[in-house]
UniProtKB/Swiss-Prot annotation:
Family from the record: Belongs to the HrcA family.
Listed name of the protein: Heat-inducible transcription repressor HrcA
One example of a Gene Ontology biological process annotation: negative regulation of DNA-templated transcription
Gene behind this protein: hrcA
Region (Disordered): 307-331
Pfam families: HrcA
Native organism: Bifidobacterium adolescentis (strain ATCC 15703 / DSM 20083 / NCTC 11814 / E194a)
Amino acid sequence: MAQSRRMLVLRAVVEDYIRSQEPVGSTTLTRDHDLGVSSATVRNDMAALEDEGYLIQPHTSAGRVPTEKGYRYFVDRLATVVPLSEAQRRGINSFLSGSVNLQDTLQRAARLLAQITGQVAVVAAPSLSKSTLRHIEIVPVSINTLLAVVITDTGRVAQHILNVTKLPDVTTLTHLTNEINTQCSGVSLTRTADCVRQMGARKEYHAISTLAETLAQAFDGMADDERASELYMAGTSRLAHQRTVADLAPLFDALEEQVVLMKLMSSLSETTQSDGVGVAIGSETHTPGLLHASVVTSGYGRTSAAATDGATHAAASSQTENQSGDDTRQAGEPVAFVGSIGPTHMDYAATMAAVRAVARYLTAFLAHDEGQPAD
């Protein structure tokens, strides 16, 4: 659309429809917006916008409502995302700072985002495939069983049972654990698996080489299992109060398909620029149950370059360097996402601001930087 006035008319229609969920007429627009032209001129502009696919007239005598194309143009070029107020930011910090651990923080974040937007909020736990090792402990639990407790850089804790024919020597096991913590801290789980295999091949660990391979397989499993990322959801009951949301049953079905949601929202958050917000509207979600919904999401906890390079020093003493690059992660890649799901007539500007603010807070939480503002 080359004409700036038509752009103003489209923005006015979208904003009014978001507020009222009623078809918008030219008389209303000229009365409520300073467009500087007559109602007849606005009516002609609306007809042109309809011809171009940005608006639709549900009934002959009714006003017009935005189409997906209209919403998309609004989100991409016309919507102004206003930062949250100081009071809202303080509220977010106050509510989330009372959490005791990562799980509690993510649960609180989902509840808070649902409360702010009045829509469904979804927060994913940091993916193990995008995490690095912070610490590991290996402890005996029976005569032929060990428990490996793995803590990642994002605070996630994973436990794995390691079955052995006989418990290893305590000194050797302690030495292996200490070396893993020294050499593999800050290294991706895939490369940690390679590092552990190389340790197990050394003479000093010959007696526990089978254990080392079992442990390496456990690290591989953690790195490969995207399903290990938990989803925290809040606000689903709010959908029932959205009187204009069509096809509620398919929408609830879509919310139950957590793997589908994970792929959709992860993909959307990863395609945004640093600190950005991604929006998928209706059919853009490629999800049948979300044809009448929009998804707003942002990544959080972005990785650093150190996380991708950490394997170099870990492998130096273990003769590695068959690093094909398959495990390389781009610096700044989000480790998880936070998002909001609501009707296509959602308040995009407010939702985008809220999602971005919560994502920033979670990034600061993972970085242990409580002083960073959630703007």
